[in-house]
Structures are given as structure tokens and as C-alpha cells.
Amino acid sequence: SMLKFLIGIGFLEVCSDKLYIYDGPAGQMIQGLGNAHNADVLLEPMVQTPFYTPTRLLIECKDYDKKKVGLDVVRGVLGLREDINHFEIVDTNILQERRKQNRNVINNYSYIRYTYQLAVASTSGFTACAQEFAATHRISLIEFDKLPFWNELMEILGEDKENVDIEEDKLKKIVKQISSHMAVAITNIGQLLFLCCQNGNEEVDFETNEYDISFKNKNESWTLKCGNKEYSFQLPEHIAESWIEYSEYEIKRKKEVIESTEKPVSNMIVYYRRNEKPVIKMLSIDEDKLQEARKKLDETTKKRES
């Protein structure tokens, strides 16, 4: 389902090249420095950022029923990121040629190098330690079961997710309908946000360049408002704290080093489809709105601790 949702929003599926990425008994595999790894969900963004190494997104999916994903899983994902990002295709001829001081230019195996960003999707949440570790190492955490469409989707699929008695075409239609009202944002700390439009069946759009965020309590989704449209999204508590804290620090630094009459802002990138075409937009939030979100987050934390 995760793969289908992201493709519906506009991400591109990565096809196996039969060498660096290949199809194995466990599914799609990706080569690493130490070994090959199973790729649960492997995608490319609809548009790459100019002047940077092209990126791909690898999502590890965990379904532990009621058990939260712990530190061991997220720590393993960090190792996975290091292993696949440090992989290089080199043969003995290249190694021998490197020993010659008057050698010709050495061309390694011809393939496009990618920087892989990692995320973990869970249907049962994450422990506090896992969240803190992920925030430190910029590993995105997705609480799939807290997305607005989750309960509806589970009712359609049935409780036994391993034995789904539903036609593939029908499932694709359902996912396409849901994803047509969704966007994906990437925050300044690398966290993925699934934005679900709350304005009925209206098409996803971000009319202005500014947004505001709010939430009622830790058991409910966050709300992002842009123009006259509202989007709900999930965010693990400790990740939310890290995001707001970093955004406030970012604005503070801009105030110190940039002389401008305009208010400094913190930015994030949003990917979505409009009229069946991919769109990328940068949204900004100012210090006052961040402080309001921080205040609400602190109040919720104090209530829980009291």
C-alpha cells in the first residue's frame, strides 16, 4: 500500500537493472558494501534537485501489530543507509590500474550514483528511544496507522492483512482515490509528512507560499493550513519537538547573519499532483506560528506528565 500511495502522489517506482538492483526471492534487492539488502519500498522523487547527487527513497515497512518499533530497528536502518550509500562497483582491473603513477584516467563502472534517504513506516508507532535516534540521524518515521484514511482502508481490506480477499484492480482504484487528495512534504530535518486534504473532494493545491501548523492533543493528527485548505498529517511526538526546535534555531540563525527587512522563515518542500502533472513547491512558516505550535506542544507534554 505504501508503494501505491507514493506512486499515486507522483513518486516514481525504481525498476531493477539486474546488477545494482535486482529481483531476488525476497523481492527487490539493492547492493550494499557488505551485502545485498531487501528493498521494501524503493522510489525516486518526481523531480531531482539541480546541482545535487540524485536521490532515492528507501522505506522499511514494519507491521508489529501492537508492539512499537524500537531502537534496534532504527539503528539497523542507519547501518543500512551507510552500507548502500558507500557501495561502489569496482573490479580488479581498476584496482590494478590505480597502482600506476602514470596511469590513464580510470573510469569506474558506468552507472548513476544515488544518495539514498531512509525512512521507517510502522503500523504500531515508535518507542521514544527510536524517535530520538531517528531525529538525530535524520531518519524519517511514518506512523501509517495514524493517517486519516487508515481505519477506512483496514475496513476494506479486512483485519487479516496477510489474507486479503480483494481484487488488485479494486485496491488500485481505492488507493488512487485516496492518494489524489494527498501530498508529501519533506521538512528541513528530512522528515516525510503525508498531507491529507480535509476539504472534501477538492483537488490538492497550495495557493500561498505560507503555512501554519496546529494540533489538539498527542492522540490526534496535526493540521497544516495553507490558504483556504487544511491538511492533516501524523508526526511522532519527539520528531515534532525536534522539527519545531530546529526550525526555531534556523530562524534565529538567519536573524543573526542576514540583514533584511523581511521576516526570516523556515521552509519545507511539498510534492503533489495537479491536473495529472507533478508539482513541487516550497512552503514557509514564520517564527510567530512556530512559537504557537511550540506552546501547544509544551502544554500537552505538561498535562501528560502531571
Which role fits each region the language model picked out?
Residues S1-S306:
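Mixed-charge (Asp/Glu-Lys/Arg
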